[in-house]
């Protein structure tokens, strides 16, 4: 009994500490975003050219008043928006039943999919996990995909969002990521999808978290992402554990093939849907198609709702974001987007990062949507979204050789960031 009480006290202390850290970090992050928006200068480098073409795309209304975008080079794929990290009363500190969370998500205007990923410590057991599966299935519809999973919540080794498993793994007694990784190697978990959750958020765990992205080649196909955005409007873009690179770059340079993931990490159904979105480019809205796209790293992470499709052109061959491409002398990255008018977000700047280092920055005109209403673009009344195309032309010697990777950071004016999944130069695996 004493041990149980001690564990509860540790958990409560951890939650209180994290809440305090969140509030202070949120203030400093907002200040930093505003400072960056006004002080960052353009950076131009030979052999990298950034062009921005606004007001290009039309939208059409589908389903529950969603705006779906038809991008001309999307190869028949669709962009679906959602969240993969949230909690209900099935977690120790969650508010709102699973039914309330799924119902709120399904009624939101732009969530195509939504996952409840309950903390496995203390309260989650096999009965509740089976019940969560059942509840999830009850909320599925033509326009909404409910997903269930769990958050492996190790006080020392870190938190991982785990999807597409029939069972969950308790972190009790686990001292390092090796315990989770051994479980993931079992045949029963062959379809598991795993995400590094909120790196660096719990500062007391920083010396040990993820054992700083220790690589394991046997599960590289299962650990598919890392949260680059956490809560609203916090962004965990760096510095990482070493203080020089961003968390995503530290993980990728450790050998992992990763997609950026946004996380609302809601612990209260009243906060659903929030602003953060994961964009998944898939053939259709089904669990099979969404999980297949996640496995291919065909995602983007954003701190505000947006429709986006990015791809790389190597010669005549097109590769969606997240792909592994062959080495070449020239490379073109095309990124098309539409931001809903009601978000009132203008783009502030575009950055090109190669192997974790910023190589080029383009400052954009600071705009509001009031400046972008000259051409009606939607069949929906009173809807004038900002839209545009970003084209990046990269030539040798700035195209990395294998292994290497390139990605964009796109900044909304005082609204956070979005990151399309990197383009990887194959064969990518570093280890």
Report residues per predicted region:
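N-terminal Sec-pathway targeting helices
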Residues: 1-12
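Hydrophobic alpha-helical membrane-insertion segments, chiefly the h-region
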Residues: 11-22
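Extended, charged catalytic domains and RNA/DNA-binding interfaces, predominantly
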Residues: 20-431
